[in-house]
Amino acid sequence: MVTCSMRCTEEHLLGAPAAFSSGKRKRDSGYSPGDATPGDRGEGGPDWPSAGIKKRVKYSRHRKQRLELRSCDSGVADLYETPSPSPVAPTPTNEPYDSPCTSMPDRLGLQSFSDYGHDCYLFNKSLEDKFLTVNCLKNQPQIKAESRCKLISWLIPVHKHLKLGFESLCLTVNILDRFLACTPVASDCFQLVGVTSLLIACKQVESRPPRVKQLLALCCDAFSREQLCNLECIILLKLCFRIGAPTINFFLQHFSLLRVTSVESPDTELIEATKSMTVARGIAELSLADYAFNAYSPSLVAACCLELADRMLCLRNPIGVRVSGYHQSLIKECVGKIDLLVSLNQDSLHRLLPSQFSVKSIKADN
């Protein structure tokens, strides 16, 4: 075992090159005097000066690009200086932040789903109860359901501003609720718990997670970098590093792909599945902020959101909640709560949906 004292001794020895000669190093390694070269014995040869061999001159090395040593906060360290962004403002687009249009019509993805989709579904279905948090605010003296609703309602536009996927948002809420279920949190640092949960979820899901300074700037620099990093370690320890939880987003994708009959399905089926899943994601975002849906499993919420989305879009072939495998009474209860939630938050729902989903194209009154 290398200790600090041993390292100091090695540095001291390496810093004194005069104490070791080339001859001594050779003798220590089994070198015999008969194997010495004329240069080692100080004897001049026909081509060697009597003073010995001249040492080769060493020139200082210059790097083409300066390396910057800094701590990594997003999983991958940025060793080089990144180029400055273009001063031209990006052109705003009306595309959804996490559009399923790029994944649903993918024929290769449909083939992979037909091969492994059922096994993945069974695996995530078996993990639901282990990651489900019921009454996570039971032991929170300072955090109420209203505070949780405000925080998640703030995290929804934050994750859209950072162009993160819906999977990151679902995983963030799961990490947040599981941490609240086991650790009391003060109200003045509740926002820090939210952005730290978002950072952990992004490191698990996203290929380019946001940087710590970005998240701190969104909090108006109310917290320090050390506070966020320390809280990140605390959350990971409290959750025993069990981060990969089944989310609503996974079951939304699974049930939507079940709507597609085969790889050779017509484009109309793919378009309907895409529209339904997009509207269901907006409904699911509303349910994430509502504490009443904390007791329902992600697969049940996903199936009920798709059921309501099919009604709102008046699709010819609704997916139905029968694919979820739950009892009819439980499905009816969950669908009724989601229907009431949508009717009370119609304006918020239309703001969450892409611009192509106009108010007239969606029948919100069911």
Swiss-Prot record:
Which GO cellular component term is one of those annotated? nucleus
Which PROSITE patterns does its entry note? CYCLINS
Q: Where does the record place the region Disordered?
A: 18-55, 80-99
Q: Which InterPro entries match?
A: Cyclin, Cyclin-like_dom, Cyclin-like_sf, Cyclin_C-dom, Cyclin_N, Cyclins_cyclin-box
Q: Mostly located where?
A: cytoplasm
Hey, which family's this protein in? Belongs to the cyclin family.
Q: Which function does this protein serve?
A: Specifically required for generation of multiciliated cells, possibly by promoting a cell cycle state compatible with centriole amplification and maturation. Acts downstream of mcidas to promote mother centriole amplification and maturation in preparation for apical docking.
Q: What is this protein called?
A: Cyclin-O protein A
Organism, per UniProt?
Xenopus laevis
